[in-house]
C-alpha cells in the first residue's frame, strides 16, 4: 500500500543534510523529547518562550505544541478502542514533526502516511520515523493536504482513519477529508480557532461556521456543537453521515472523533434529527434545544428568547465509547494524567445531553454566593437528577434538573 506513495514521493529530493548530517541526532537548536512511547526530534522548546513564560509553537520552524498532548493521548486511546485490527491504514494529514502519526504507529499499530506541505516538516517527519524504527509501516509525504486527499480518491486506496489537526480552523480541509474514506471509517478533527467558534468574533462565526451567534455562558459547549453541525452539513452534502464517538474542549482547542458512514439515507436522518437550534434567555439564563426555530417557549421574564443555529443537538459523546476508552487507559501507563481525568468526566457528561450551566453566572443573576460545586451535585442527585461537573469549564455543571429547580436548590443553600 505504501509503495504507491513511495514511488510518487521519489520526486522529492531526499537530503537529510538540509538539517543535520546524522538524521537521528539533534542539532544545537533541537532536542529529543519523549511523548507516550515515541521519541521525537523537535526544535528546542526553550527558544520559543514568550515573555510570560508560555510556549509559542507558531514561532517554531516546524510546529510542535507540547500542550496538545491530551489531544494526542485521546487519539491513541480512541483508536485502540475502535479499531478491531492492527492492519488499518491511516493518514496524519497535517503532521508537523510527525508526533501524532508516530504515536499511532507505536501505540496502536497500522500503516500510516504522515503528510505536511512544509518541506522542513517533511524532513523532521522522515527523521522521526527513522528514530522510532517505523520505516516499514510509516511513510513521510510532502504534499498540500487537499491535493493529497483528492489524489487518494483516484488511487483505489481507501483510508480507515484520517486525522486533521490544523493551526486554526479545519474548514479548508473538511470537504476533502471524506472523499477517500472507506465505507465505514473514522476521522479526528481539531479546531483551534475558539474565538469565532465561541462567538468572540461574531462576523467570523457567521462567515466560517454559518451561524448568527450571541454571547452565552456555555460558550465552550457552543463551540463544540457548532463545529459538529458544520461538519455534519458538509459531510451530508457529500453523502456521508457522522456519529460523534468522543468530543471535548480543552485549553485552546475543540477535538472531535467521528464515525463516518457513506450513506445518503443515514445523512438525511442525521440532518433531520440532530441539527436544530438553541433558544437562550440572556437575562435569566434559561436555555434549551429545539428542532424548529419557531417552536420555543417564552422566558420567565416575559421576554422572547434569542434563537440561533443550526447547531448539533444530539449527544456529543457515546457513553459506551467513553466507558470503553476509560477501561483502555488502565493498560497505558504513559498517558498524561489530564487525559484520564477528562475521560472520566466525559463518561459522566455523555449521559446528560443538556447544555452546561456556569454556576458563577447563575449565582450572579440570583445575587448569591456560589456554593461548593460537589455539594450542589450531591443535592441534585439526592433529588433524583443526574448531575456532573463538566470538563469544559471548572465553574460549570451538567444536570437533567430544570433551571428553576437548580435555582431553588441554590437559593436554599445560600
Locations of regions flagged by a protein language model:
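SAM-dependent transferase fold signal centered on methyltransferase-like domains
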Residues: 1-414
Amino acid at each position: 500500500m505504501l509503495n504507491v506513495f513511495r514511488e510518487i514521493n521519489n520526486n522529492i529530493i531526499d537530503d537529510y543534510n538540509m538539517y543535520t548530517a546524522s538524521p537521528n541526532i539533534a542539532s544545537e537548536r533541537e532536542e529529543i523529547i519523549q511523548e507516550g512511547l515515541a521519541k521525537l526530534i523537535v526544535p528546542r522548546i526553550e527558544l520559543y518562550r514568550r515573555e510570560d513564560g508560555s510556549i509559542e509553537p507558531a514561532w517554531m520552524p516546524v510546529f510542535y505544541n507540547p500542550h496538545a498532548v491530551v489531544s494526542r493521548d485521546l487519539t491513541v486511546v480512541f483508536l485502540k478502542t475502535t479499531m478491531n485490527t492492527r492492519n488499518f491504514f491511516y493518514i496524519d494529514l497535517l503532521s508537523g514533526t510527525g508526533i501524532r502519526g508516530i504515536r499511532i504507529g507505536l501505540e496502536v499499530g497500522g500503516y500510516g502516511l504522515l503528510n505536511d506541505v512544509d518541506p522542513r516538516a517533511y524532513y523532521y517527519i522522515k527523521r522521526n520515523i527513522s528514530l522510532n524504527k517505523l520505516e516499514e509501516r510509516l511513510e513521510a509525504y510532502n504534499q498540500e493536504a487537499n491535493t493529497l486527499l483528492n489524489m487518494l480518491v483516484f488511487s483505489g486506496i481507501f483510508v480507515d482513519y484520517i486525522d486533521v489537526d490544523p493551526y486554526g480552523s479545519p474548514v479548508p480541509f473538511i470537504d476533502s477529508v471524506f472523499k477517500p474514506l472507506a465505507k465505514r471509517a473514522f476521522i479526528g478533527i481539531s479546531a483551534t480557532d475558539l474565538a469565532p467558534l465561541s462567538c468572540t468574533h461574531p462576523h467570523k462565526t457567521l462567515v466560517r461556521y454559518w451561524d448568527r451567534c450571541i454571547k452565552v455562558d456555555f460558550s465552550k459547549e457552543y463551540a463544540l456543537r457548532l463545529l459538529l453541525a458544520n461538519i455534519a452539513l458538509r459531510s451530508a452534502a457529500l453523502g456521508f453521515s457522522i456519529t460523534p464517538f468522543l468530543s471535548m474542549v480543552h485549553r485552546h482547542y475543540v477535538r472531535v472523533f467521528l464515525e463516518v458512514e457513506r450513506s445518503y439515507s443515514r445523512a438525511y436522518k442525521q440532518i433531520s434529527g440532530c441539527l436544530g437550534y438553541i433558544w437562550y434567555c440572556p437575562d435569566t439564563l434559561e436555555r434549551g434545544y429545539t428542532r424548529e426555530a419557531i417552536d420555543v417557549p417564552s422566558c420567565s421574564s416575559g421576554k422572547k428568547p434569542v434563537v440561533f443555529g443550526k447547531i448539533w443537538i444530539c449527544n456529543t459523546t457515546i457513553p459506551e465509547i467513553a466507558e470503553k476508552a476509560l477501561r483502555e487507559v488502565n493498560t497505558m501507563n504513559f498517558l498524561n494524567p489530564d487525559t484520564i481525568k477528562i475521560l472520566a468526566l466525559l463518561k459522566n457528561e455523555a449521559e446528560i445531553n443538556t447544555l452546561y450551566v456556569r454556576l458563577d453566572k447563575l449565582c450572579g443573576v440570583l445575587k448569591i454566593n456560589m456554593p461548593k460545586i460537589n455539594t450542589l451535585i450531591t443535592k441534585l442527585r439526592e433529588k433524583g437528577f443526574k448531575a456532573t461537573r463538566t470538563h469544559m469549564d471548572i465553574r460549570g455543571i451538567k444536570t437533567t434538573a430544570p433551571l428553576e429547580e437548580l435555582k431553588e436548590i441554590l437559593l436554599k443553600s445560600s
